[in-house]
């Protein structure tokens, strides 16, 4: 027997970042939107402990040891229910690695849900979310999907209404960016500044609720974008190429280096993707639609 769970990527349509806290984290107002790029995590019983394998374009960049969030999720669930984490976790990876789209977090949420189903632990949604929050700031949203406002360090979620489809184009960069490195650069750039408390922008929430891409395009923001561009200046060329191709909005996705472009509709997204592919400013281009469902057990 095995259990396979499909988990979406995310884009941040608002990422407001406060000053560093004493624990090193930052308070956030983080508006997540799940999009239709997916990893699949398959859990299969094993007699010899925990093992992680991976396939996909970026598989060589995925750690297969216990630093992988999928492995940590299985261990956390096993420890909570007093059992051995005897499982083989296989990740079919389509979400970019180190791309600012929560690919690692998706694998953690997927492994957690897959192991819960495989082992019959019957964990409640609240228990699963509690374990997710212990794994990382983005993991709870990977479990929930749809759209949500994350506060605290992003792990406290309030689900949001989405009134229609939003069409996106994602340009994948030639190399990754470390999320901790981007936050360190954010701190460096903001040294001496009095940063405001991060709050959700009502214009973003209203645009999502109405399914209004034009209104969302005006409202999207990412406080980490200057830090990502400081560490990876070439991303400015990708953003410019997408804007010139007709994107309603162009921004760095989360901590980057994936860049995200909001399109009017599916045809516009396809056109923008074609221009970006020909621009020479990125290694690959993907299109997706949001909001997508969260972690889902496949039949």
From Swiss-Prot:
The active site is at residues 10, 138. The keyword ATP-binding applies. InterPro entries: GHMP_kinase_C_dom, GHMP_kinase_C_sf, GHMP_kinase_N_dom, IspE, Ribosomal_Su5_D2-typ_SF, Ribsml_uS5_D2-typ_fold_subgr. It holds the Pfam family GHMP_kinases_C. The gene is ispE. Coiled coil: none annotated. It comes from Streptomyces coelicolor (strain ATCC BAA-471 / A3(2) / M145). Keywords: ATP-binding, Isoprene biosynthesis, Kinase, Nucleotide-binding, Transferase. Pathway: Isoprenoid biosynthesis; isopentenyl diphosphate biosynthesis via DXP pathway; isopentenyl diphosphate from 1-deoxy-D-xylulose 5-phosphate: step 3/6. Catalyzes the phosphorylation of the position 2 hydroxy group of 4-diphosphocytidyl-2C-methyl-D-erythritol. Belongs to the GHMP kinase family. IspE subfamily. It catalyses: 4-CDP-2-C-methyl-D-erythritol + ATP = 4-CDP-2-C-methyl-D-erythritol 2-phosphate + ADP + H(+). GO terms for molecular function: 4-(cytidine 5'-diphospho)-2-C-methyl-D-erythritol kinase activity; ATP binding. Its EC number is 2.7.1.148. NCBIfam families: ispE, PRK03188.1. GO terms for biological process: isopentenyl diphosphate biosynthetic process, methylerythritol 4-phosphate pathway; terpenoid biosynthetic process. ATP binds at residues 96-106. This is 4-diphosphocytidyl-2-C-methyl-D-erythritol kinase.
């Amino acid at each position: 027997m095995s259990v396979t769970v499909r988990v979406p990527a995310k884009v941040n349509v608002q990422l407001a970042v406060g000053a560093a806290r004493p624990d090193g984290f930052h308070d956030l107002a983080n508006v997540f939107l799940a999009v239709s790029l997916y990893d699949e995590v398959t859990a299969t019983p094993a007699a010899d402990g925990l093992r992680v394998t991976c396939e996909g374009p970026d598989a060589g960049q995925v750690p297969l040891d216990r630093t992988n969030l999928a492995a940590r999720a299985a261990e956390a669930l096993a420890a909570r229910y007093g059992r051995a984490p005897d499982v083989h976790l296989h990740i079919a990876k389509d979400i970019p690695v180190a791309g600012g789209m929560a690919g690692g977090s998706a694998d953690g949420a997927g492994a957690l849900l897959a192991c819960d189903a495989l082992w019959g632990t019957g964990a409640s949604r609240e228990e699963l979310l509690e374990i997710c929050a212990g794994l990382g700031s983005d993991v709870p949203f990977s479990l929930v999907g749809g759209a949500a406002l994350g506060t605290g360090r992003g792990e406290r979620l309030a689900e949001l209404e989405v009134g229609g489809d939003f069409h996106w184009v994602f340009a994948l960069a030639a190399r990754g960016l470390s999320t901790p490195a981007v936050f360190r650069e954010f701190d460096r750039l903001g040294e001496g500044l009095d940063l405001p408390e991060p709050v959700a922008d009502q214009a973003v929430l209203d645009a999502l609720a109405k399914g209004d891409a034009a209104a969302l395009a005006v409202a999207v923001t990412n406080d980490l974008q200057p830090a990502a561009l400081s560490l990876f200046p070439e991303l400015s060329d990708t953003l410019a190429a997408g804007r010139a191709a007709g994107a309603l909005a162009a921004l760095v996705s989360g901590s980057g280096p994936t860049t995200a472009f909001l399109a009017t509709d599916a045809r516009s997204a396809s056109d923008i993707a074609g221009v970006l592919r020909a621009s020479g400013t990125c290694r690959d281009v993907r299109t997706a639609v949001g909001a997508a469902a969260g972690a889902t057990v496949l039949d």
